[in-house]
Amino acid sequence: MAFRNDIDSSKFKFPEPTNPNTCIRDIMEENEVSVKYYLSTVYIDTLKKHKARHESKGNGFGYEIRDLDGKAGAIVCGGMGRERNLIIDKRLTNFVPVTHIKGEVNREGIRKMTPREWARLQGFPDDFKLELADTHLYKQFGNSVTVNVIEAIAKEIRKVLENGK
């Protein structure tokens, strides 16, 4: 953290985590989500083959199905990371696709996280309106800095600015 030379920043400290025990289950949608978030059997097969191909070359690419009681992986710019944050959610009752997919909707309950779940991961409140297409929302949240982190750092900066002159 950088401050002007005329400000005593020696008392600045990065905030401690406030809730290190938050897990994926805590940010999941309360109700059954649309079938559009569930992967097709063909796509899952493609991910498995792609991962095996990369592993055979010693590379680290791969999809990952996250434990609901564990932590989410990084969501990064451009909305990448969706395949590294797959979850199993067996609440789906209607397996009829609402978009064009190859194959059938998987019956294992493997799905990508929803934009609302990504918003929650980034600290956005539930009343934050998600009024764009999912693709744009994934990109926005992937490019976002976690709201709670920025808020906590800003409070510490304010303390320094109020007391540092």
Give short role names for the model-derived ranges.
Residues M1-R82, T93:
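Class I S-adenosyl-L-methionine
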Residues R84-I88:
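Cytochrome P450 core scaffold surrounding the K-helix E-X-X-R motif
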Residues V96-L132, L137:
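FAD-binding beta-loop-beta segment adjacent to the flavin cofactor pocket
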Residues I150:
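Acidic-aromatic/histidine active-site loop/patch
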